[in-house]
Amino acid sequence: EHTVQVVRRELADPRTLEWPLQCGLTVIAAHSGTKSGLFDPQYFHHFVEMTRRHPRLYGDISAFNVPIRGSVVPRCLQKPLVERMVHGSDYPVPVFGHWAWLQGFVDWKAFRQWERQPNVLERDYQLKRAMGFPPETFTRISRMLRPSLPAKSA
């Protein structure tokens, strides 16, 4: 991929998030610990293990419509991990539906339809829905950013 320069490759490892998680913060791991380039380390297995220990750890699904990251999609769609996924777009990185089509997530007609969609955020959303990510993946962030407040006493 390498659309954006990676400054400190070691920070892609979700284990660097242990301290904030131990302090009780809610944390979203970028790309759910998946690798960026062909020769980069794959940290997804660490992310999955960490979600078992840290209920406030989430992973974003930005750039999941590329082969190098998309290979983890089937695992991300399984419970309980799917409940820890949140939408991320990686905008302005371009979104293409080739991988979703080649993997059978979308048929040729849907692929062509979304490839012509000029709104890249809409294209990204529709392709990820076609890949199987449930609606909650795209709305979960609102609960995380605005936790419910205690009821006012009368």
Language model feature labels by segment:
Residues 26, 33-154:
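H/E-rich (His + Asp/Glu) clusters that bind or coordinate divalent metals
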Residues 1-43:
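Divalent metal-binding pocket/active-site signature
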